């Protein structure tokens, strides 16, 4: 973090330490402003950064530390920076892994002296600056492009419990979108495992997209203040590329729910009374502070894709419901589908997008998507009857619907590039036209007599045709 403070810094001293929260006393009449940065000196080479959150009295502030407070004691000196905490931005951070306060954490060289710094707190773009894009953001993932298309400059989130594939989807999207759009990617890892961050860094290096990517990590072992502000640090980097360098940016956040959890920890340490289900009373405003800054302006856009952990698979959870309200596309991951190895485990009925409109995606795409949904919904309605009585008890029309629904669900599975090491299957990126053609052929009955396995984990439908031809040849 650059020392971008005023020429004269106001000094004070610690009067109390409550875990990650510290109280600092300053001279009368020079109290730092809310959200201003505080540097707490200690014997170690790296000082502790904190952020002002409360004014307790005319001479005392309460601040949240963004680093480890172990070793601090009352009486230690502290300095107000005169500005909010700032993060490095621009080309200097591309290919680098930073912590929540913008310090390199990848054992690489120090950032160059010419690096530009920018405060992590900023206002959302004014309404007259916003640009309304209706350009579809193609991901190459069949089920998303068909049923929950993303918009360039919009916000999408993947909802799911633990272990259903959110992080794998995020990693695949980084790879495919950087290759397709040649833009900048900014990844915020909030409250996730160190192992996952290491794997992501290696994957980005191996795929050659790291030079166009900046990573910001606030890992699960770090203090809540660091996890709480890692998202704003990453967003500030993305805003600089959008506003100053006029680049289109892909902002990926894994995991927004961990940011909410960190905010809850901070809220408790600050002494605020919890609200519904124990969440912080500022839940809505904290989520909005992040989400409303993710926007498109004339000439450049920030497209955001976020992973959201759903506690106990409860989609009525207040934090999950609040995040839903800010999105253009919602991609819901199903534990049932994951248990059946139907990857990506995207629920075709629960997932939705405001972009799935005939005026935006075209009449053919809209009609095919609706037929796919209707067919799968009909199959799910019949599943209980099938379990009790068997498929033979269904009418011929219902049996045909079941047959096509099961083949559609298998066609919408897809191997990913980032999972080749685990599955041994080469990843596929599929154009929307190929996805629509494949679904249309299945709906029209072409695959009625094919083995379901022929459609499983493929890209385009032609692969299934080849499997069927090979199978027929082997049997003849």
Curated annotation (Swiss-Prot):
Its EC number is 7.1.2.2. It holds the Pfam family ATP-synt_ab_N. GO terms for molecular function: ATP binding; ATP hydrolysis activity; proton-transporting ATP synthase activity, rotational mechanism. ATP binds at residues 160-167. It is found in: Cell inner membrane. Disulfide bonds: none annotated. It catalyses: ATP + H2O + 4 H(+)(in) = ADP + phosphate + 5 H(+)(out). It is a peripheral membrane protein. One of its GO terms (cellular component) is proton-transporting ATP synthase complex. Keywords: ATP synthesis, ATP-binding, Cell inner membrane, Cell membrane, CF(1), Hydrogen ion transport, Ion transport, Membrane, Nucleotide-binding, Translocase, Transport. It comes from the Bacteria. NCBIfam families: atpD. F-type ATPases have 2 components, CF(1) - the catalytic core - and CF(0) - the membrane proton channel. CF(1) has five subunits: alpha(3), beta(3), gamma(1), delta(1), epsilon(1). CF(0) has four main subunits: a(1), b(1), b'(1) and c(9-12). Belongs to the ATPase alpha/beta chains family. PANTHER family: ATP SYNTHASE, ATP SYNTHASE SUBUNIT BETA, MITOCHONDRIAL. This is ATP synthase subunit beta 2. It comes from Bradyrhizobium sp. (strain BTAi1 / ATCC BAA-1182). The gene is atpD2.
């Amino acid at each position: 973090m650059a020392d971008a403070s005023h020429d004269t810094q106001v000094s004070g001293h610690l009067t109390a330490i409550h875990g990650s929260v510290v109280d600092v006393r300053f001279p009368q009449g020079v109290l730092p402003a809310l959200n201003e940065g505080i540097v707490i000196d200690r014997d170690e080479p790296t000082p502790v950064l904190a952020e002002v959150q409360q004014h307790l009295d005319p001479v005392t502030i309460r601040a949240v530390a963004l680093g480890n407070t172990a070793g601090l004691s009352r009486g230690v000196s502290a300095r107000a920076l005169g500005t909010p905490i700032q993060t490095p931005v621009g080309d200097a951070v591309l290919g680098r892994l930073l912590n929540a306060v913008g310090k390199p954490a990848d054992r690489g060289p120090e950032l160059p002296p010419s690096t530009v710094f920018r405060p992590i707190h900023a206002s959302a773009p004014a309404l007259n600056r916003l640009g309304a894009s209706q350009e579809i953001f193609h991901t190459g993932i069949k089920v998303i492009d068909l049923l929950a298309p993303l918009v360039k400059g919009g916000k999408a989130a993947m909802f799911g419990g633990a272990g259903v594939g959110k992080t794998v989807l995020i990693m695949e999207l980084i790879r495919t979108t950087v290759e397709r759009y040649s833009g900048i990617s900014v990844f915020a890892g909030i409250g996730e495992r160190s192992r996952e961050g290491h794997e992501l860094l290696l994957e980005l290096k191996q795929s050659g997209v790291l030079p166009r990517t900046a990573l910001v990590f606030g890992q699960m072992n770090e203090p809540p203040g660091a996890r709480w502000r890692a998202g704003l640090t990453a967003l500030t980097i993305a805003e600089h590329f959008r506003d100053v360098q006029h680049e289109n940016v892909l902002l990926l956040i894994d995991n927004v729910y961990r940011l909410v959890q960190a905010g809850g920890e901070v809220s408790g340490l600050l002494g605020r009374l919890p609200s519904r289900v124990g969440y912080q009373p500022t839940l809505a405003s904290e989520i909005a502070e992040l989400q409303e800054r993710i926007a498109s302006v004339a000439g450049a856009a920030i497209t955001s894709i976020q992973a959201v952990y759903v506690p106990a698979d409860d989609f009525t959870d207040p934090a999950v419901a609040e995040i839903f309200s800010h999105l253009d596309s919602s991609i819901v991951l199903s534990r049932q589908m994951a248990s059946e190895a139907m990857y990506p485990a995207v629920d075709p009925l629960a997932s939705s997008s405001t972009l799935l409109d005939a005026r935006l995606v075209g009449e053919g795409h809209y009609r095919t998507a609706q037929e796919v949904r209707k067919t799968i919904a009909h199959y799910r309605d019949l599943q209980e009857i099938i379990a009790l009585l068997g498929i033979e008890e269904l009418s011929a029309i219902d049996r045909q619907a079941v047959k096509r629904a099961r083949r559609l669900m298998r066609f919408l599975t897809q191997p990913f590039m980032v999972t080749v090491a685990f599955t041994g299957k080469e990843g596929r990126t599929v154009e929307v036209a190929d996805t629509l053609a494949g679904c249309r052929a299945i709906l029209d009955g072409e695959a009625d007599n094919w083995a379901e396995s022929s459609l499983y984990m493929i890209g385009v439908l032609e692969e299934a045709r080849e499997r069927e031809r090979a199978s027929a040849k082997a049997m003849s």
